[in-house]
Amino acid sequence: MSRQLEPYQQIERSIQKTYHKRLWTPFITAVKQYDLIAPGDRIAACISGGKDSMLMAKLLQLLQRHSDVPFELVYLVMDPGYNAANRQKIEQNAALLHIPVTIFSSDIFEVTSSVGQSPCYLCARMRRGYLYSKARELGCNKIALGHHFSDVVETTVMSMFYGSQLQAMPPKLRSRNFPGMELIRPMYCIHEDDIIAWQHHNGLEFIQCACRFTERAAETGNDGSSSKRQEVKLLLRELRRTNPGVEKSIFHSIHSVCLDTMVGYKTGGVEHTFADCYRERGEMTQEDET
């Protein structure tokens, strides 16, 4: 007679069995392809309480359990001013998933609530600073965030449509303000739709953004559907009807940038123009190649 699995074990099995191809495989692909984890790393898995960061924490936990590469994990939750219900939901989900979280508090919601409309950028910047600081205090050399494939694609499109530049979201980067520390994105190759499917399969409920701004928006009927990211989500959804591979094409495009055809680009904070590079090469551009 087979032993009845605990809820957290059933959730783990769903990752490794039912959603192996859609979650575990792309997770491992990102870790290996972008060299995200090295022997001796001490990583702070940063958990906001949403579906993405909770899944990321579970994936890293499973990897640590089975990997030949030795590394340490800290499961870090920053409470930026959650209401009691959201704080409780995070703690309950962490217990359900058997994730031993370390929780610390900050006043981010208090500060950003006075900014005015859409304080999301400031909130994100402040969150990252607090997370880096606490992670370093706990002896970590890396923080892991739950950004996924869909975030990468949407950010790339948003940079062109609203930022007048071609800028992507890298799978890892070095911190400028916290020397010696890095940020990694282990879910870089995982699609959001697959995360949602896994969540529903297991009957899990996670918090959304949960900040005071979004709470007020929900109360007034403005649920954020006018946000630029939401606009891009809807656009990509529409494009998928005629081109199912559009998001994959955008994702692959940031891995295959042909600088010879770019009129201008920036690297290391230094701007380069097509004219400068053209003179340096000392050769004519062949029209039949473009």
Outline where the language-model segments fall:
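Short, basic, helix/turn surface patches
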Residues: 126-138, 172-178, 233-253
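Catalytic subdomain that performs nucleotidyl-dependent activation
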Residues: 150-236
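Short, solvent-exposed coil/turn elements at secondary-structure transition points
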Residues: 79-81, 107-109, 175, 189, ...
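ATP-dependent adenylation/nucleotidyltransferase module used to activate substrates
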Residues: 2-158, 162-166, 170, 193-197, ...
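A structural signal for well-ordered alpha-helical scaffolds and beta->alpha junctions
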Residues: 20, 24, 87, 128, ...
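Long, contiguous hydrophobic alpha-helical segments, chiefly transmembrane helices and signal peptides
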Residues: 27, 31, 187, 232, ...
